[in-house]
Design a protein with these regions (language model features):
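ATP-binding N-terminal substructure of ATP-dependent carboxylate-amine bond-forming enzymes
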Residues: 1-47
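Short, charged, surface-exposed secondary-structure boundary motifs
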Residues: 7-9, 50-56, 168-170
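A conserved helix-loop-beta module that forms one wall/lid of the active-site cleft
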Residues: 42-104
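Structural detector of well-ordered beta-strand residues that form the stable sheet scaffold
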Residues: 19, 42, 93, 134-136
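Internal nucleotide-binding/catalytic subdomain
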Residues: 108-226
């Protein structure tokens, strides 16, 4: 938490490469600070980390880059959320905008459950991560994970994976940070993976470059196959 103390320790131990894994230090700009101090860092700068720590920013990024994504609404109050929920003709997923250790996504089965999920977020369940709520069209299908190792301009794909987030057996219960995963994801054929690269991975890299976002690290793509 003490950035100055961390820099002193890195200098003292003559660290050649700093690998930043957790999202919170990246969201707080640790990679930016260390690069200014001339350390070699594996991990995106704060702007790049927004893809992970702000769902609304990531959704708007995808829209701008013409990346397929579910319809969504960014809301700033419970009143605004309730209005959209009441008017919606499609099932919705309720998400805290910020980091919530993988627990900030609610999959309600009724309008009342939508209200309760939005209320719990706005009432501080996830602190400042819940200052904004994202209401998203609910889509069905298996989830897969794609990982791209990026140097700021180019990328190479790592092996695919399929994780299971629901707490209980038979894919039921609330979402967690992950109950288990296996790799590679068997449902991703070479043809399907080529489609994902063309429609999702490459447009993401191109949009980052257009915005002059120096993304050096692993980009995680959490996808739902419909």
């Amino acid at each position: 938490n003490n950035k100055n103390e961390l820099v002193e320790k890195l200098d003292f131990f003559k660290i050649d490469l700093v690998i930043i894994g957790p999202e919170i230090p990246l969201a707080n700009g640790l990679a930016d600070l260390l690069r200014k101090k001339d350390f070699k860092v594996f991990g995106p700068n704060k702007d790049g980390a927004k893809l992970e720590f702000s769902k609304s920013w990531a959704k708007e990024f995808m829209q701008k880059a013409n990346i397929p994504t579910a319809n969504f609404w960014k809301v700033n109050s419970i009143e605004e959320a309730k209005k959209i929920i009441n008017l919606s003709s499609i099932p919705l997923v309720v998400k805290a905008d910020g980091l919530a250790s993988g627990k900030g996504v609610f999959i309600p089965n009724s309008i009342d459950e939508c209200f309760k999920a939005a209320e719990s977020i706005f009432n501080g369940k996830f602190g400042n991560s819940g200052n904004i709520v994202v209401l998203e069209e609910k889509i069905q299908g298996p989830e897969v994970s794609i990982f791209a190792l990026c140097d700021g301009e180019r990328y190479t794909l790592l092996p695919t994976a399929q994780d299971h987030k629901r707490l209980n057996e038979k894919d039921t219960g609330p979402n967690t940070g992950g109950m288990g995963a296996y790799s590679p994801a068997p449902l991703l054929t070479e043809e399907y993976l080529d489609k994902i690269i063309k429609e999702i991975v490459e447009p993401t890299i191109n949009e980052l470059n257009k915005r002059n976002i120096d993304y050096r690290g692993v980009i995680y793509f959490g996808l739902m196959i419909t």
